[in-house]
Curated annotation (Swiss-Prot):
Family membership noted in the UniProt record: Belongs to the kynurenine formamidase family.
Lineage, highest ranks first: Eukaryota, Metazoa, Chordata, Craniata, Vertebrata
Subunit relationships: Homodimer.
Species whose genome carries this gene: Mus musculus (Mouse)
Subcellular location(s) per record: Cytoplasm, Cytosol; Nucleus
Protein name: Kynurenine formamidase
Keywords: Cytoplasm, Hydrolase, Nucleus, Tryptophan catabolism
Domain of life of the organism encoding this protein: Eukaryota
Domain comment (free text): The main chain amide nitrogen atoms of the second glycine and its adjacent residue in the HGGXW motif define the oxyanion hole, and stabilize the oxyanion that forms during the nucleophilic attack by the catalytic serine during substrate cleavage.
Enzyme Commission identifier(s): 3.5.1.9
Amino acid sequence: MAFPSLSAGQNPWRNLSSEELEKQYSPSRWVIHTKPEEVVGNFVQIGSQATQKARATRRNQLDVPYGDGEGEKLDIYFPDEDSKAFPLFLFLHGGYWQSGSKDDSAFMVNPLTAQGIVVVIVAYDIAPKGTLDQMVDQVTRSVVFLQRRYPSNEGIYLCGHSAGAHLAAMVLLARWTKHGVTPNLQGFLLVSGIYDLEPLIATSQNDPLRMTLEDAQRNSPQRHLDVVPAQPVAPACPVLVLVGQHDSPEFHRQSKEFYETLLRVGWKASFQQLRGVDHFDIIENLTREDDVLTQIILKTVFQKL
């Protein structure tokens, strides 16, 4: 299959040295609130504590299988009040497709369930066990599973961070007829994501992934939005592309260009830079109801109801 090719002018990353490219795609090197060598550990600790609190204080169903694979599990957290019709918020963790877990990713559970939203944290097989193609398939099937499990839902809102934002963006390209169900997708929130994977091939991030050029091109939503027919999701389904002020320039470029492509091909897209946050605390802060991103999520969900 031939993939859309972009010129060097359209790909400014081609002008970067290998050292600069490595820096641009190393989020920990751009943080300002903590030491680069400590930020990932802090992120995992905050996520683990939030998950432990959510499991202790919210009704939940853990390790629900959405497929036959060992890694195909998800955690479901419920509001206090019982209801057969509720919005579903699905979160896909980051970690460059090679780290991270649903077991340390329930940052937003307490603030969102307090407002009547069911929160689902999805696991997928990270590298080296899982390939990008497998991860995309797993995430897509998790959405199908939840639509079938909760057919009366008031909307599915898919949110991903970093690598998870990439996987969520790939769901925009899903062919639902293949799965025999059209999910009630009502919103996408793509946080600090990567939408063209080719720049990563020459970085250390690719060591566990072992991505080839074809792998990267096939799994780059930036390259397929305008060549794949519009999918059967709600015409007014918003796609919010968000990036932290202190994400790297390459993360900013990728987010802005993906937003512009979304607009060009007819999606209801918006772009927002969140001030004062980096690649990590943009998600860490979701433990707070008064956080900017928490409020964006609530507004996105409830303005649709």
